[in-house]
Amino acid sequence: MRRVEHWVRQPGPESRHSLHWLAIAVSFALLLTWSEGLTQTYGLLRDPVEVVKKYVSLDQRGIRLESISWETIRPYVNWKEEPSWGHVMVTVGYKIVDDIKQWEVISMMEVLIPVEYQVLGAVYLEAPGFLPEKQVERVKFRVKAVGGRWRIIEPLLPPHVGQKRMINYVRQAMLQELEPSRLAILTALRDELQKAK
């Protein structure tokens, strides 16, 4: 019995200290892995069209109208920052082609997914105004595997916001506007957006 005790290492202050740091390192690694999983769940086992659906849906709801919302779309795209746009495309709908036969497959890790926007026109932000330009805009979103997740690589388009959301955005600006001449411009813009078909 004495021989066995001789070979068993007794816990001392050094081993407790090492164990403490090991526990902290493991906890930190788990926390990082867990938080990355929360911010983006579009791993390579999922369908790449899901990233496009989520991004286009958020854009339609006006998430890109405010720069503070950048963190919301960051998990879906590969660009580092959202540029400031001088205009916003106003839409009445969109259609995402989710049939893989209609995609352009570049490789196993890269595809082009078509989206059709029903555009009413554009709202220019500097001197608020609506330029009607009814059209169907066809865009191919390049989705690629980046860091083990699907990300939109391009195109970097101006915001494509739904008509109702854009009207509400202008209404909110009207409530915050104190200058009468600017309020008149925003009122005219709201009226134009409401009439657009």
Report residues per predicted region.
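Short, well-ordered alpha-helical segments enriched in acidic and aromatic residues
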Residues: V51, Y55-H87
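Surface-exposed, charged secondary-structure patches
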Residues: Q40-L44, P83-V136, I185-K197
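Bacterial Sec-dependent signal peptides at the C-terminal "C-region" and cleavage site
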Residues: L32-Y42
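Low-complexity, intrinsically disordered terminal/linker segments enriched in charged
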Residues: L44, P48, V52, V56, ...
